[in-house]
Amino acid sequence: MFLKYGKPEYMTALFEEGQLRVQPASEYAKPDHNGAVRDDELALEVYLYLTRETIRNVVSNPQDVPEDLEWKRVDFRFSRPNDFWLYCVTSSAEPRLFVDFNAAACVIIRDREEFRRRLLAAGAAAFPGARSRDGNAIYIDPLRPRSARIDVPLSKHFKYAYQVEHRFVWEPASTNPLTYRDVVLGSLNDIAELVLL
């Protein structure tokens, strides 16, 4: 099951017509968003604790690594050089999400696979030449990342883990500035239900 929370007029349009807006990832960093929405989707900072041996293996001057160094915290900023389009849904039916997303409605999508198929098909037409992919968000504890490889479009700080996101990403081939795109999937009334508060 997927859920999308929002204003009644937008959720009604999503349910009745399959109409949705896909934003550039950079849009979410704007200060007018609340704390549940605002995030730098183009970068993620993590902090790794490396042993002396590991540091010696990766630096160009291993002879300069002090002998008495046991470990060192190294700060990394994983970032995307280019913007991408992003659309998120959740698997969580927590009442808190109505408040966090300033929502008075939600669409409950019962058939995840059919919604995914429709969105990716409509996305192929809306984002020609873009590489599309989707997946569950990977929540990263910046002090204890499980890997030094971070997939920025699918990754988020673990403070957002309660949102249980599934992300749809379209990565354009060009580096031109992006604007939102309105995408239409057709009515979702066969795979979803609309809840208005």
Predicted regions and their residues:
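NAD-dependent ADP-ribosyltransferases
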Residues: 1-197
